Amino acid sequence: MYRFGIVGAGMIADFHAKAIDAIPNAELTGIYSRSIDKANAFSTKHSCAPYDDYTAFITSPDIDIITICTPSGFHLEPISAAAKAGKHIICEKPLEVTAERVDEMITVCAENKVMLAGIFPRRFNASSQLLKQAINAGRFGNIAMADAYIKWWRTQEYYESGAWRGTWKLDGGGALMNQSIHTIDLLLYVMGDVKSVRAETRLVAHDGIEVEDVGIAMLEFKNGALGVIQGSTACWSKSGHPADIQITGSQGSVFMSDDRFRVWEFAEESEEDEEIRCKYGLNEGEVGAGAADPSAIDFVWHQRNFEDVLNALDNGIKPLVDGFEGRRSIALLNAIYRSAKNGGEKELV
């Protein structure tokens, strides 16, 4: 039985608690918050011990794994302390706001022989695995373009719900760093790393924030393909747009909306292709989870992510999203922001 403690009692912590509760060999034993009132409320809801003393929390013999649900720019410090206390760590996206801070996290976890894992649930969808397998099998021929489109909406109230939201120091960026990062990570997971990028960002629909609510980047992948990222929280719609990935090549095209395929076509059809279209095809009227409401996501993919970490611990192997994997999207986003700041000049990743 693995015993979990959660750091931070905000919205995403509820998803962690539900995911842990659904895993047979996992138990939530503690919640830490700087506010004892929040810790008490969370502990009552999820039946775990409340803490407002971080040292007592990370040294508790009743906790094996700590999950981090603090603001993005405040992941390094609690992770460093937890690693030195011998706790394994699962950290919400993004791992941190700069690649350099992620490097510090990776180092301190390695020095203390504890596991560092990130949370990118889209990797665990069956459709994501099918897309990666098709790319690895060369079914696209020469890949021409690999694109990500995340045209979402967040209200002004969303950005005003926490003083840290929309700040460079603690949010690390805007629509690209926070909402688009899941899809950006998936693009890197299936396509490999990006060599260089040109980008522009704008603030269109929100007041009082430092970061972008619209961003566009043109990518050159190391494998020679070109691509585009469009990410926004300024795109209102009645029910929300799905997050799309589009991979197109000389022998095939796949358009994936969230975890469904709008297009799954190859010049050389396999026996499984029609079954894939039937089982994972996009149903008319389906909308993107979290596209307009950040709480409208299913905890099951966090559960799959956590189960992968527990399997890695059981078998002495790397989790699918280790510290180095979690770093990839941060390095790309840092380059995107550098390019946008420099007037769209090419930046190496």
Task: Pin down the residues of each PLM region.
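N-terminal Rossmann-like dinucleotide-binding module
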Residues: 1-46
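Beta-loop-alpha module in the N-terminal Rossmann-like domain of NAD(P)-dependent dehydrogenases
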Residues: 48-108, 301
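Hydrophobic residues in well-ordered beta-strands that form the structural core
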Residues: 52, 68, 91, 116-118, ...
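Rossmann-fold dehydrogenase core element
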Residues: 103-122, 141-148
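C-terminal capping/lid region of NAD(P)-dependent oxidoreductase domains
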Residues: 114, 141-145, 338-349
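Predominantly a Rossmann-like dinucleotide-binding segment in NAD(P)-dependent oxidoreductases
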Residues: 122-209, 343
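C-terminal glycine/acidic-rich active-site capping loop/insertion
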Residues: 221, 244-324, 349
